[in-house]
Amino acid sequence: ACAATCGSVCYTSSAISAAQEAGYDLYSANDDVSNYPHEYRNYEGFDFPVSGTYYEFPILRSGAVYSGNSPGADRVVFNGNDQLAGVITHTGASGNNFVACD
């Protein structure tokens, strides 16, 4: 089952957890790959179920964990307490904005 659908891409809860874990591990080590994770400022005004500061990290359609190069369109968003805020995508959004994944 899809825990999040970004455009036509289905992400399972385990894929989301793996991306969040990889992003949070880098965040907590004060490290990054290709400038991810970085602070997500929520200019779009999403009503996330957890409070921020938020960080974004790519979640890849291939199922691999992001290790650099092209981040693709989709992101997991988590806070500094390693709580998942949501999954967002550039797919279907204008310019460099994000929309929520279903």
From Swiss-Prot:
InterPro entries: N1-like (IPR000026), Ribonuclease/ribotoxin (IPR016191), Ribonuclease_N1/T1 (IPR051386). It catalyses: [RNA] containing guanosine + H2O = an [RNA fragment]-3'-guanosine-3'-phosphate + a 5'-hydroxy-ribonucleotide-3'-[RNA fragment]. The active site is at H38, E56, H90. GO terms for molecular function: lyase activity; ribonuclease T1 activity; RNA binding; RNA endonuclease activity. Signal peptide: none annotated. The keyword NADP does not apply. Keywords: Disulfide bond, Endonuclease, Hydrolase, Lyase, Nuclease. Pfam families: Ribonuclease (PF00545). Disulfide bonds join C2-C10, C6-C101. Belongs to the ribonuclease N1/T1 family. This is Guanyl-specific ribonuclease Pc.
